[in-house]
C-alpha cells in the first residue's frame, strides 16, 4: 500500500520556476488560439457563401424562377390606382350618393358631438366602415332615421315626428336627419342641407340642383382628403350657428 501511495506524495522532479513564469508561458502558448478560431470561422463563412452562391445560381437557372422574374412589374403597376376613390372603393361612394346625398357628409360622418346622437358608438366611422346604432341600419330604403337613443338636446321631438321631419332640434339645428327619403338632411341651415331654415317636411332637399355622378365623386374625394383639424373647425363653426336656435 505504501509503495502504491508513494508516487502521489513524493515528487520525482522539482523545478525552480515560479508560478508567475509558469502561467506566463502558458498564456503565451494559448495566444495563437483566437487567431486560429478566427481563421477557421472565416473559412467556414467562405464555404457557406460559396454554397449560397451555387444555390442562387441553381435557382436562377430554374425555368419557374426565370418566368417569375420576367413578369416582375414596377411598383406603380403592382399598386394600381392610388387616388382616394380607388382606395375607398365603390360601396362608400354608393352610400354617400344614395343615402346621404353628398352634402350632408360633414355632420353625419363626424359624430355630432354637440346635440347629436348620444349613446352607443360615435358616428365618426359612418363612411369608413359603416355604422350600426343598436342594431339599426342608418338608412332603410331611403326612410328617415329614428334610432332608439336620446338626443343631447330636445330628445326625439322633431316637428312631425321622427318619421316625417327628423330627430328634433338638438340633432342638427332645426332640421333633423329625416325628410321622407328625400335626403339625409332635408332642412337645416344653409350649406349643410337644403336652403334656408324651412320648417316643412324635408323640402330643402328638393331645391338642390341635380348633381352628376362625377360631381358627387369629386365632392367625396375632396371631403375625404381634408384633415381632421379642418373638419373639426368646420363643425365647430356650424354648431356655433345652430346653438342659438337649439336654446329657443
From Swiss-Prot:
Placement of covalent cross-link Glycyl lysine isopeptide (Lys-Gly) (interchain with G-Cter in SUMO2): 70
Gly residues composition bias: residue spans: 157-195
Subcellular location: Nucleus; Nucleus, Nucleolus; Nucleus, Nucleoplasm; Nucleus speckle
Residues recorded as bearing Phosphothreonine in the entry: 242
Gene Ontology annotations for the cellular component aspect, listed alphabetically: nuclear speck; nucleolus
Residue positions of motif GAR motif: 194-203
Residues modified to Phosphoserine: 40, 49, 64
Molecular-function GO terms, alphabetical: methyl-CpG binding; RNA binding
N-acetylalanine: modified positions: 2
Annotated protein name in UniProt: Chromatin target of PRMT1 protein
Native species: Bos taurus
Lineage: Eukaryota, Metazoa, Chordata, Craniata, Vertebrata
Amino acid at each position: 500500500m505504501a509503495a502504491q501511495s508513494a508516487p502521489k506524495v513524493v515528487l520525482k522532479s522539482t523545478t525552480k520556476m515560479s508560478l508567475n513564469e509558469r502561467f506566463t508561458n502558458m498564456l503565451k502558448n494559448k495566444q495563437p488560439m483566437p487567431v486560429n478560431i478566427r481563421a477557421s470561422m472565416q473559412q467556414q463563412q467562405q464555404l457557406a457563401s460559396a454554397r449560397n452562391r451555387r444555390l442562387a445560381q441553381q435557382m436562377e437557372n430554374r425555368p419557374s424562377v426565370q418566368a417569375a422574374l420576367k413578369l416582375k412589374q414596377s411598383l406603380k403597376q403592382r399598386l394600381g390606382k392610388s387616388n382616394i376613390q380607388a382606395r375607398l372603393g365603390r360601396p362608400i361612394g354608393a352610400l354617400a350618393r344614395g343615402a346621404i346625398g353628398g352634402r350632408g357628409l360633414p355632420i353625419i360622418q363626424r359624430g355630432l358631438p354637440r346635440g347629436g346622437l348620444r349613446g352607443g358608438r360615435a358616428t365618426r366611422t359612418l363612411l369608413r366602415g359603416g355604422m350600426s346604432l343598436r342594431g339599426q341600419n342608418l338608412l332603410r330604403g331611403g326612410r328617415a332615421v329614428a334610432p332608439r337613443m336620446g338626443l343631447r338636446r330636445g330628445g326625439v321631438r322633431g316637428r312631425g315626428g321622427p318619421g316625417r321631419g327628423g330627430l328634433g332640434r338638438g340633432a342638427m339645428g332645426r332640421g333633423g336627419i329625416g325628410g321622407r327619403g328625400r335626403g339625409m338632411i332635408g332642412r337645416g341651415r344653409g350649406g349643410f342641407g337644403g336652403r334656408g331654415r324651412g320648417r316643412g317636411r324635408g323640402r330643402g332637399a328638393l331645391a338642390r340642383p341635380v348633381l352628376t355622378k362625377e360631381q358627387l365623386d369629386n365632392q367625396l374625394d375632396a371631403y375625404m382628403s381634408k384633415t381632421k383639424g379642418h373638419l373639426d373647425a368646420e363643425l365647430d363653426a356650424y354648431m356655433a350657428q345652430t346653438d342659438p336656435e337649439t336654446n329657443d
